[in-house]
Amino acid sequence: MGTARFLRAVLLLSVLLMVTFPALLSAEHHDGRVDICRLPSDSGDCLRFFEMWYFDGTTCTKFVYGGYGGNDNRFPTKKACMKRCAKA
């Protein structure tokens, strides 16, 4: 029974890495810098409730930020998000 649980955990971790890793790679510039506008929304680790904006690849969308952690694709206003991420 313990082996089955371990294998299930390894499989779950493998799937999670296969989904997350390409998204992070696609967010990198050729010089190694990360384009924050290509990062996925990340609500962070805490349980606070802040309405923030992130760029979803097309436009800026509201999401709830927990107040700690997350990534830099997080803006206090739609205007700030569009200014940083919208391509003219």
UniProtKB/Swiss-Prot annotation:
Matching CDD domains: Kunitz_huwentoxin
Domain of life: Eukaryota
SUPFAM superfamilies (alphabetical): BPTI-like
Family note: Belongs to the venom Kunitz-type family. 03 (sub-Kunitz) subfamily.
Residue ranges listed under propeptide: 28-33
Protein name, UniProt field: Kunitz-type U15-theraphotoxin-Hhn1e
Expressing tissues: Expressed by the venom gland.
Disulfide bonds: C37-C85, C60-C81
Gene3D superfamilies, per database record: Pancreatic trypsin inhibitor Kunitz domain (4.10.410.10)
Cell compartments where the protein resides: Secreted
GO cellular component: extracellular region
TM helices/strands, residue ranges: none
Gene Ontology BP annotations: envenomation resulting in negative regulation of voltage-gated potassium channel activity in another organism
Its biological purpose: Serine protease inhibitor that inhibits trypsin at a molar ratio of 1:1.
Signal sequence, renumbered to the chain: 1-27
Occurrences of domain BPTI/Kunitz inhibitor (ranges): 37-85
A GO molecular-function annotation: toxin activity
Keywords: Disulfide bond, Protease inhibitor, Secreted, Serine protease inhibitor, Signal
Transmembrane as UniProt keyword: no
